[in-house]
Amino acid sequence: MKTQMLSAQRPEDIAAAAGLLRNGKLVAIPTETVYGLGANGLDENAVLRIFEAKGRPQDNPLILHISEPKELESICHDIPAQAWLLAEHFWPGPLTMVLPVRDLVPKRTTAGLDTVAVRCPKTAATRELIRLAGVPIAAPSANRSGKPSTTTAAHVLHDMDGRIEAILDGGPCEVGVESTIVDLTGERPRLLRPGGVTPEELRALLGELDIDRAVLGQISNDAVVRAPGMKYKHYAPSAEVYIISGSSEAAARYIRRRFGPGDAVLCFAEELPLYDGCNPTAYGSENDVRTLSAGLFAALRDLDRPDIRTIYARCPEGGGVAYAVGNRLKKAA
């Protein structure tokens, strides 16, 4: 199979991608978070191809993407007022909600659960694609399972060339880490995965928010999960990743004492002079944490090379988007 490159800047290419999706084909789609591996979320055979192309465990549910908030009612029932409040404030955008699912959604999409994860992406071309396709699009990150997520079309082509029909190139992703996921099916809202919408923003709107044990790394691989990204090793290059926190100077002393052949450093831009001779890669500025989220996966992919066996990764501290960046680094380690 030859993977076709399409442009999100061309309306005819968006229409062509929509036609492929309607006919059960796989198309990688751009979003503000990461690229998604898209299929008709109501077509069980098309959804199966997602799992096969990624090498993804089938107990890992998928996120359905819709073109506008009102489409939520077609795939979910018993939607609480909190969901509409969140949609009003954060859709279109990097927030996914877990809600009770209607019967028309295949069990393969939901991993057999009675709930489904849904989001309305910010990227206008992708919303138009979904509208033209006329179906919700199931789309996990467009990378081989376990590897760093894809934030450019070139990343997708590296992982998926010959495995999928097309890639819709929308340029680099703005946010750079996957969406925040919040479960609204319990007595209290529960954060299942941190992302572009922060816990602080959710609490300010909802008044309460529990943090799932999976976010804290306290979940076993035999646990049943309600959303993607909650178990299994994710986002990882082939090298061993060691997370290094603390002050810049103390971290540099620690790393330099241990640094050897086959090692690399993933650090903040301000720290590059501290790692002269240590093969450093900066993934953003410590003073602008959103540059860290935007640059993280691209940097991990750059360091996913046969000559690199160990990566010492500097991890931002604190809440907000830094919490999501730290979560992804810990999943990679």
Language-model features: locations:
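Active-site-adjacent structural elements in enzyme catalytic cores
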Residues: 1-333
